[in-house]
Amino acid sequence: MRQRTIERSVEVVGIGLHKGVPVTMRLEPLEENSGILFYRKDKNRYIELKPQNVVDTKMATVIGKDGVVISTIEHLMSAVYGYGIDNLLIILDNDEVPIMDGSAISYCMLLDEAGIMEQKSTKKVLRIKNEVEVRDGDKYVRLKPADTLSFDFTIHFDHPVIGKEHYHFEFSKKNFLEEIARARTFGFLHEVQYLRSIGLAQGGSLDNAIVLDEKKILNPDGLRFEDEFVRHKILDAIGDLSLLGMPVMGLYESFAGSHHLNHLLTVKLLEECSNYEIVEASTTTQEGYVIGAACAKE
């Protein structure tokens, strides 16, 4: 299986979730073996997509370098991962990725517009060899060895609409588009009100998030999936997993996970070389996920 980039440059204008200010985002092709690279045009600063550059995970996944940051990258990166893109330049003129509708589907449409192009170099895959786990009380995230990438997620909220939700997801581009990409971010009205009082969530609205009060969903059109909340948690995790810089072969299990735990898991995984091996992708399904590999450890 070969590395991929986009065929042509594309651009979109939206607003940032927290500051609520307009931001222009441009996606451009990159040559093979370049990886995913962000560029803050207003600060003339490049930031590589890697766990070492994560600077904040409280409300979103934020990367930064030398004091220059880019916030809320996870939904975009979930789409980039879903499309199997290895090399991409993401240019922004502000410090937030545009939130769009709060899911990944708008970014998927943007990538469809750009087109996907295979390159000459073989795609590298990170294969999990040893189980790695991070816990915070009863919350946990873990990666286990497996021959494909899949997610087994459970969330539990003390809310009559959400309660306990579980979803098992077998990763492929087709499944991503059908089951995960349209799942929106969500929040509670009292949290939104507090965030706005401290200058955050200025761009949040019912057009780009599911908002719940104490008893019900406030969005007039309701949910896109009965279990949209846990599906969005998987969307987030895919985006956070993209910071590893290559596709992953493993089972990702989570109970009440978060951006913070996702990040700690990627860091812990990379701490010990025995936890993983890097192989060349050799066999794929029609949808594009790896089901076999030729050993080529680096």
UniProtKB/Swiss-Prot annotation:
Pathway: Glycolipid biosynthesis; lipid IV(A) biosynthesis; lipid IV(A) from (3R)-3-hydroxytetradecanoyl-[acyl-carrier-protein] and UDP-N-acetyl-alpha-D-glucosamine: step 2/6. One of its GO terms (cellular component) is membrane. Keywords: Hydrolase, Lipid A biosynthesis, Lipid biosynthesis, Lipid metabolism, Metal-binding, Zinc. The keyword Zinc applies. The active site is at residue 259. Coiled coil: none annotated. It catalyses: a UDP-3-O-[(3R)-3-hydroxyacyl]-N-acetyl-alpha-D-glucosamine + H2O = a UDP-3-O-[(3R)-3-hydroxyacyl]-alpha-D-glucosamine + acetate. Its cofactor is Zn(2+). One of its GO terms (biological process) is lipid A biosynthetic process. Gene3D superfamilies: lpxc deacetylase, domain 1, lpxc deacetylase, domain 2. InterPro entries: Ribosomal_Su5_D2-typ_SF, UDP-acyl_GlcNac_deAcase, UDP-acyl_GlcNac_deAcase_C, UDP-acyl_N-AcGlcN_deAcase_N. Catalyzes the hydrolysis of UDP-3-O-myristoyl-N-acetylglucosamine to form UDP-3-O-myristoylglucosamine and acetate, the committed step in lipid A biosynthesis. Belongs to the LpxC family. This is UDP-3-O-acyl-N-acetylglucosamine deacetylase. It comes from Nitratiruptor sp. (strain SB155-2). The lineage of its organism: Bacteria, Pseudomonadati, Campylobacterota, Epsilonproteobacteria, Nautiliales. The gene is lpxC.
